[in-house]
Amino acid sequence: MTVFTSAALLAALAIVARAHTPSKPDLSRCEAAARTETGWVCGARRRAVSGSEYASFLAVPYAKQPLGELRFQELLPAEPWDNIREAKVEGPVCPQTDVFYGRIKTASGGMSEACIHANIHVPIEALPDPKKPPSLDAKAAPGLPILVFIHGGGFAFGSGDTDLHGPEYLVSKGVIVITFNYRLNVFGFLSLNSTQVPGNAGLRDTVTLLRWVQRNARFFGGSPGAVTLAGQSAGASMAQILTLSTGARSLFRRAILLSFSDYFSPSAQFVKTINSLFFPLLGINATLPADEIHQKLIETPINEIMDANKKLIDLFGVTTFTPIVESYQPGITPILEDDPEVLLDSGRGRDIPLLIGFTDAECESFRPRFEQIDIVGQIEKTPALVVSPRLTFLSGDQLPVVAELIYNKYFNDTLDLDGFLRLCTDQFYKYPAFKLASKTSGETPVFMYRFSYGGVDSAWKEGLGLKFEGAGHVEDLTYIFRTNSVLGPLGVNESTRRDDDAKMKNKMSDIIVNFMKYSHPMPGPLGAGQWPKTAARRPPQYLEANGPKRIFKKKNPTSNLQHCVYKSIYAIQMKMEIQQMMHFRPLYCVRTH
């Protein structure tokens, strides 16, 4: 039974903490040591780009591994260990089929369901002396700000590994960086609408990690009251959902959403569709009672589940199982009890400062995948595919109207991949960012940027073998985290580089760290004037990050037709708005300068 906020689980955690006070092992051969609530860990000392050192603790379990009967269950507390645990090598990634990252994601630790681990990176001077008990006095030792980062990957692939999420740019600026793995695809987002599998296991894993951070932050020199939750792509969508969730309240203070998207539908109708396609691939009758399906899934070998999951990914393109709105289940506190937009409109999450980022050419990064699945050919057969999955509840006579609006704006009577990529960028990334900023601004600071710096030597483009103008999906992330799989070992001269790429990495990491510390990406009189927060009930402004010398260029999304078109396309929450939309023509939008 899922009870992540229940008194029973909290009591169990308290018992574990009291019952196991880690005995101090021999730490003489350990470069960097830290205690946790379940035992001591031995990490490694590494060098950041500034030349400073940090302690890196890899593959630290934040819960018991979900094996066997625990495959789809709420995570249980991690089991304690007596000797010191080596934490110098990354653990396995969660089971997945990667159709996007290519050689950028190395999975150096293999792949396994025993993947529930966190990676903790701490400036060496902040790490508590292992010879002394950690200070629990916040006034005497306030602790460093903590960035908890949720990796992206369409809810289906990816990891918190340092191949893409190297902390070298951030830890040198006085913050702690924590990345982690969570269950993916069917293991993380299957819903049987039952007490055994209510859905959103990957989100529950994230809440479990956040609770672990609250209990263990002091052991690593961090402040449990200064946690910023960040994510990229699917990870940003998860972070945004958790800003709305009562189950995650008080576990973090700020949120950073990079390439946030609402490209998935959290509806029960979508759940039924995905399940009806998936279960037959495993020889399971989709009409069986939920408890019987659950048992069959537990008994099914992992390789068979992954084979079926790959077939489903090939059918859908990238994303399959996703976060869903949970129905009421006795004894279970839902992560997501209603559509995120409904919760936003009710005022939920407006007390959390937000930094929202997107790139100017998001979907160029997906060009190889869209070519592989022949997305243009699929649209020719099914024109309604140009419409966002969030609008799939439209009736048959409304879908063609929305599709016509999209065709008029993006294709000019010629359906091609270039037009689709522009549509994809606007529909799944740019407009959701505008919409979210508009809905959440006013009561708390909300800032937004568009990253359009293409780079001199882009690690992202090199890693995927891509060439295009501007910045694609994930590309801004590579100026915040170091792409170690492409860049290789940190060079001795890297900290002294002064080219535009190095300056941009410094600028972007400054933005993240400033927001973590001050709830403003550019604090001080200069920044307040050049990067104002988004005003309530007004079209959101964003800053154009297109180079280290031109990062302060303000933009307004209403300066082109894009915002007008999508405001009309998405104005479908009420019947009246649908009727208004059906009479809309892009010709009537007025440009503002």
Regions found by a protein language model. Name each.
Residues 147, 207-210, 214, 275-279, ...:
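Non-transmembrane alpha-helical segments in soluble domains
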Residues 299, 303-500, 518:
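Substrate-gating cap/lid region and adjacent catalytic-acid/histidine neighborhood
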Residues 3-7, 105-294, 344-367:
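Serine-hydrolase-like catalytic core of hydrolytic proteins
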Residues 2-19:
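Cleavable N-terminal signal peptides of Sec/SRP-targeted secreted and luminal proteins
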